[in-house]
């Protein structure tokens, strides 16, 4: 009996997936929010991030703007070239990892958490590259090394499901998995619209959150935020998005 209940439930979910159009649902929810609020949630978070960017924090009494100018005027276009190698870190960093490093080393902030305030700052910094083309390069040896690690992780089959990133986003791209359409990483330039607001769970996510979420979807324990594996996959995805126009925060199912 239990077996048949499971089969019927799966078929029911499949039927719903065929009836719903995720793209239309995104459009509908976006229009509804703009009509009711006049602004999208992601843009609200970005504005909050701008305020925090200019606010002193940590033992050094500095703000992000102390180094990068009021409202980050010296960071315009920076996100379009990330992840990248940073000499002061002697490492490749994505947006999240770089912000964490700067907070700890230059601002004296202890115990940096990947919380909503952190993600709001990251989102604001990313908006400073809006309208610019993604142009991640692999000129430094450590950038090339990290990219290769990301590529290896992309194709690695892991977990009880024996799944890989490539199975979904290369082989099965464009197909429906319940209420979502699997995106094609290169063609859809996915890195250009993260950070993003996800209306399905009412949360602001950075690219690190999205990558970690995919580990969970594959029934594999995700690496911690700022882990090299997350940065490596981020670099792989961002390099594949080269030439795409940055438009953040995205509005995602």
UniProtKB/Swiss-Prot annotation:
Cited Pfam families: SoxA-TsdA_cyt-c (PF21342)
Cofactor (UniProt): heme c
PROSITE patterns (UniProt xref): CYTC
The protein's Enzyme Commission number: 2.8.5.2
Keyword Signal: yes
Cell location: Periplasm
Function according to Swiss-Prot or TrEMBL: C-type diheme cytochrome, which is part of the SoxAX cytochrome complex involved in sulfur oxidation. The SoxAX complex catalyzes the formation of a heterodisulfide bond between the conserved cysteine residue on a sulfur carrier SoxYZ complex subunit SoxY and thiosulfate or other inorganic sulfur substrates. This leads to the liberation of two electrons, which may be transferred from the SoxAX complex to another cytochrome c that then channels them into the respiratory electron transport chain. Some electrons may be used for reductive CO(2) fixation.
Gene Ontology MF term list: electron transfer activity; heme binding; metal ion binding; oxidoreductase activity; oxidoreductase activity, acting on a sulfur group of donors, cytochrome as acceptor; transferase activity
Protein name: L-cysteine S-thiosulfotransferase subunit SoxA
GO cellular component entries: cytochrome complex; periplasmic space
Cofactor info, note text: Binds 2 heme c groups covalently per subunit.
Chief localization: periplasm
UniProt keyword list: Electron transport, Heme, Iron, Metal-binding, Periplasm, Signal, Transferase, Transport
Enzyme class, broadest EC rank: transferase
Binding site for heme c 1: 64, 67-68, 102
Transferase is among the record's keywords: yes
Active-site residues, Swiss-Prot/TrEMBL: 214 (cysteine persulfide intermediate)
Family assignment from sequence similarity: Belongs to the SoxA family.
